[in-house]
Amino acid sequence: MQCPSCQHTDSRVLESRAADSGKSVRRRRECLNCEFRFTTYERVETMTITVVKRSGTRETFSRSKLLTGLVRACEKTGLETNRLELLVEEIELQLQQRNQKEITSQQLGDLVLEELGDLSEVAYVRFASVYGKFSGISDFITTLDALRQRNQVKRQLAKIS
């Protein structure tokens, strides 16, 4: 592992422990050249998922890009970044379990909205407005009506169970 301070390639592991609920390993290292200490994370390499955009272009699924979009949508909603990171992990896990190499941006957005609807109605509408490219107030009204109906159905199902 290359030292971020001096770029020397030899380091020793001082400590290792499980991270991300056992999905990765956190290692504390020390450079053998300059004694700089740094942390690395190892995680299982999963199947690469390609997102097919509306324009037809393809790009590799990016956890950080999704998290950035969620953080922006959830500003001032009280949702903590830790919860959003878990949400991104849940979504990525769902994508991996589908065992499909491609997903459309529409399908990905719908998956995100399904999860966001349970966390924050405000974040749901904010995310939907960007992902759905709202063009006017009627788009907001349609989304709010759909969200209201979705939540009513969920409440009714919860009463039945």
Swiss-Prot record:
It holds the Pfam family ATP-cone. One of its GO terms (biological process) is negative regulation of DNA-templated transcription. One of its GO terms (molecular function) is DNA binding. Its cofactor is Zn(2+). Keywords: ATP-binding, DNA-binding, Metal-binding, Nucleotide-binding, Repressor, Transcription, Transcription regulation, Zinc, Zinc-finger. Residues 49-139 form the ATP-cone domain. InterPro entries: ATP-cone_dom (IPR005144), NrdR-like_N (IPR055173), RNR_NrdR-like (IPR003796). Binds 1 zinc ion. Coiled coil: none annotated. It comes from the Bacteria. Belongs to the NrdR family. Negatively regulates transcription of bacterial ribonucleotide reductase nrd genes and operons by binding to NrdR-boxes. This is Transcriptional repressor NrdR. It comes from Synechococcus sp. (strain RCC307). The lineage of its organism: Bacteria, Bacillati, Cyanobacteriota, Cyanophyceae, Synechococcales.
